[in-house]
């Protein structure tokens, strides 16, 4: 098993993209401890860590997707006001990495692991949310459906509880999975683990990746999965608070989407949306 912390990072020269924003060098991996406060994940795969200001990527160069992305979400950051740019661009710190054209004509969305809505609190951070090393191929009916609902729910929990969260978002993939573009693996599942940093409560969800995605309504509890099972399925080992309390199956923190929208509009303007 290889510890992400010990893997070698790759630095890139400053590069200006066609979207007229300048890519910054990745930070030292140790700087991303804020996004992995309980410890870095451990994987048997050959993983390259990429530390950004707002998130940590465990990038799998062989699959050209992130194995997992970790980040912290605070109440103020959950109400960011930077408009979405859709500035998808290759990560210049990765040689031979994924590019937007790998997804062209495939029917798959360029699906964020660390979502733009959680990273809209700073202009440069919002741009960095669109680096292709933060993307996986996702069916639009999942990416824009119940997956998006979970992303919005996490922001609601942060704002309404006035508490910070540590979030792990990852791909479930392996031999035999579909490949698009020039070697980009399409995961057969995705997961999200959320830790409340104040209460040490933990909850996990896992989603099979099928297209079109069935309409199962807005009940996220149908996708709850014990974190031990997620780790076994995804072949990744995470660290958790020593006194962590996993929420019972079928239980989640309540969220008021109307109140979240009102809070966003109060901060960002009348046309702002929570999602």
Task: Label every model-predicted segment.
Residues 49-110:
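Short, His- and charge-rich active-site/binding loops that engage polyanionic ligands
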Residues 20-64:
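N-terminal module-boundary/linker segments of secreted carbohydrate-active enzymes
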Residues 6-11:
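Sec-dependent N-terminal signal peptides
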Residues 1-4:
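Positively charged n-region of N-terminal signal peptides that target proteins for export
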Residues 92-275:
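Domain-level detector of nuclease and nuclease-like folds
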Residues 15-17:
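N-terminal signal peptide c-region/cleavage motif recognized by signal peptidases
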